[in-house]
């Protein structure tokens, strides 16, 4: 009904897509974000290389404004492709940290994660996220949902449409299911 109350949990990752911009603009190890998917798929193992893109501190669930970025596990064999893949995976690890806390606090298990934004175009990242969460990841056809959400809220407020119509109109581009390698 129009009088029903709905709740949402939100967790902020301060640096997500901006970490891919960092690879491009500061490190200059990619020309554009699209190539990160092919590069990530080109190597099998990361061999314990982790990127923490805390360039502006860490958001949820740590809320540490003093944290700074780091790369762990570098060896002489580490190449640009390892740093690229580890940076992509860092986005999924940050999301997992938030989802774990949300599940604990709400006592509700995640069945499906709906994603948006430029990073969700990356199939490698979305599949890695699905595997890491052991949950379905759903990418919509329209990935810039912030503007669309503002429009939906305006339409709801002005009674142009109702919540059920908005839900019905959501179009899915792709669903990623968890795949666990033996």
Task: Go through each PLM region and give its residues.
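Glycine/Thr-rich phosphate-binding loops that ligate phosphate moieties of nucleotide
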Residues: 1-182
């Amino acid at each position: 009904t129009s009088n029903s109350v709905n709740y949402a949990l939100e967790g902020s990752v301060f640096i997500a897509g901006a970490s891919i911009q960092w690879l491009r603009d500061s490190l200059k190890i990619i020309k554009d974000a699209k190539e990160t998917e092919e590069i990530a798929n080109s190597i099998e193992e990361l061999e314990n290389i982790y990127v923490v893109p805390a360039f502006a501190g860490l958001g949820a669930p740590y809320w540490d404004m003093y944290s700074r970025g780091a790369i762990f596990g570098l060896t002489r064999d580490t190449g640009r492709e390892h740093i690229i893949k580890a940076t992509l995976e860092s986005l999924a690890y940050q999301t997992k940290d938030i989802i774990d806390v949300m599940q604990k606090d709400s006592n509700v298990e995640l069945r499906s994660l709906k994603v948006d934004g430029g990073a969700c175009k990356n199939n490698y990242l979305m599949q890695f996220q699905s595997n890491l969460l052991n949950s379905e990841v759903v990418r919509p056809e329209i990935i810039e949902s912030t503007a669309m959400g503002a429009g939906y809220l305006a339409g709801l407020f002005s009674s142009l449409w109702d919540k059920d119509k908005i839900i019905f109109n959501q179009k899915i581009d792709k669903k990623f299911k968890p795949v666990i390698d033996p």
